[in-house]
């Protein structure tokens, strides 16, 4: 993380800008039921080494430790999930728990939002959204 003091010309104000590098991957997987698809996702994440992974359309009713481990093999991880509603949907957010600490999780009908604490920075909110492809459900979206 890098902290910089910036003076805004003409305003007489000074602000502190915090710059940090974070790799976030967001992916609509269209289901993670097959081992083959989970292996493709796992291999990709292993090669990219993200800090946060947001997966839409997991099509999973439950995302337990074993399932999450089959997708992302990083040792220090935490996650939050919104289960499927019927045969579609489902959101899973996984993150490196050494870099980000969960402060709050909000599960919406079509979203997962997480407030993270980061060393030396203000809190950060990240959200993953998956909208329904059903016209009757879209009005609730």
Region annotations inferred by a language model:
Residues 1-141:
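Short phosphate/oxyanion-binding micro-motifs
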């Amino acid at each position: 993380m890098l902290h910089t003091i910036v003076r805004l010309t003409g305003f007489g104000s000074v602000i502190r800008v915090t710059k940090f590098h974070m790799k976030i991957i967001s992916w609509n997987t269209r289901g993670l039921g097959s081992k083959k698809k989970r292996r493709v996702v796992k291999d990709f994440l292993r090669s990219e080494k993200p800090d946060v992974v947001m997966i839409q359309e997991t099509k999973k009713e439950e995302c337990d430790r074993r399932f999450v481990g089959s997708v992302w093999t990083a040792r220090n991880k935490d996650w939050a999930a919104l289960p499927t509603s019927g045969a579609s949907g489902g959101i899973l957010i996984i993150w490196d728990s050494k870099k980000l600490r969960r402060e709050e999780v909000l599960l919406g009908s079509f979203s997962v939002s997480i407030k993270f604490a980061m060393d030396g920075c203000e809190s950060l909110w990240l959200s993953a959204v998956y909208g329904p492809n059903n016209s009757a459900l879209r009005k609730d979206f």
